[in-house]
């Protein structure tokens, strides 16, 4: 995901986000320029006040100024509000749009992408990187226009009053430009490192929060604290590098500006060199030059904000540029019959040499139960991932109702499968909404209740204080493993898909929970094609066909009785689980 785009190209792409806010930008620019020009104009009033009427105080001028100063500063405040509020509004809109784009992209990127990128870093892009973009769109642009307008306004009055003295200040321009160019590259590099460090920090915190029970059980507090401290210190160091670069650049430019000011003062001390300067003109020019130091400092500082924003844009664009899931199918499918077929399927996971599946071929007739048995890592779960097209096979063809999976629209294809896994995913929402997930707007509360009853979930739901409206916490942390599993089954019941995938659905459950869930699964499997991935052979004895897999290849295939009679790999697995005396079960 590494991009090395030039700043100009990144800014052009970023500018696309701003094109919808042309009117707002116009208002903001008017506000910021008006604010700065008032400041510059106030400085220009020093000359007539000091020089007065032939060197005497002009009391009429002072009286007019007294009436004039309040409206001027009211106008200054209005201009400031126009510029600051409008730019803040624009930056918030840009951040919102970028976050929505990232979120949408995350949902449509292939599973392979999420396999290779820590969730903490992806979250950091949504939360932290977009805020850096806001800094570029808001604070940086505000400072650039407002302080830039002030610089031009002050230079205008300086040249108007004494172009000879003002010319000295212009000579520092190339030096300032050179410093800004060098420092910009440093800002960009350090900003990129800060974003990477922030992503690592977020990942570390997320891991500990999710796995805090494991940390407590194994006494890993000191280890994790040390790891986090190291990453936290790295983040601090990167931020300090940015601060150092910022301080050095600001100080360098201010020193150069002070040299120019010193030259002006020295020239002014030579009466024969400049003879037409009045005291008021001299004071106005010197004060304007002194006031230039602050906007020059701000313009140098804003460079760091801008470079942080551009580095964040590169980070965000690197995600947005990833290809989303390929959905090349055109066939619409309402409800499949449920026939599945693998024809000479070979599949490699990315960056792995050994095939997860090799020349895999089998057929599952509609309404039949097909069980997959084998050691961990043999390729059982890979089959279910290929059926739902989380991955695509490199060789061979997978068919649903005699049609290759790639020919169907992805959304229609996945609607044909209901997955119940040992790794249940629930959301921080009500029980009813979790059961109805994916079916919202298409089901009634009565149907949700019926699904819960079929899954034997009502037994515990009715005991909760708010029943179906009970909030269950992140990933159902308020529920037991068996309760979470039953909600997953209820979700599958409500989906009413023609093909059911059960991936270790009853593993690691107590006997009572397993009995209830097994009853619910038997009801769910009726009139559906079922793919059952199991370690517990007792759960698949009634399967129509059992496939024994080893290292991605089919070792044996048949029903429970025939495989036992062959006394092969399946029979050996059965003996390990039940003992020699129960091989006829």
From Swiss-Prot:
Residues 27-308 form the ABC transmembrane type-1 domain. It is found in: Cell inner membrane. Its EC number is 7.5.2.6. One of its GO terms (cellular component) is plasma membrane. The chain crosses the membrane at residues 23-43, 64-84, 140-160, 163-183, 247-267, 273-293. Pfam families: ABC_membrane, ABC_tran. The keyword ATP-binding applies. The keyword Nucleotide-binding applies. Residues 340-576 form the ABC transporter domain. It is a multi-pass membrane protein. Keywords: ATP-binding, Cell inner membrane, Cell membrane, Lipid transport, Membrane, Nucleotide-binding, Translocase, Transmembrane, Transmembrane helix, Transport. ATP binds at residues 374-381. Its main location: membrane. GO terms for molecular function: ABC-type oligopeptide transporter activity; ATP binding; ATP hydrolysis activity; ATPase-coupled lipid transmembrane transporter activity. Homodimer. Belongs to the ABC transporter superfamily. Lipid exporter (TC 3.A.1.106) family. In MsbA the ATP-binding domain (NBD) and the transmembrane domain (TMD) are fused. This is ATP-dependent lipid A-core flippase.
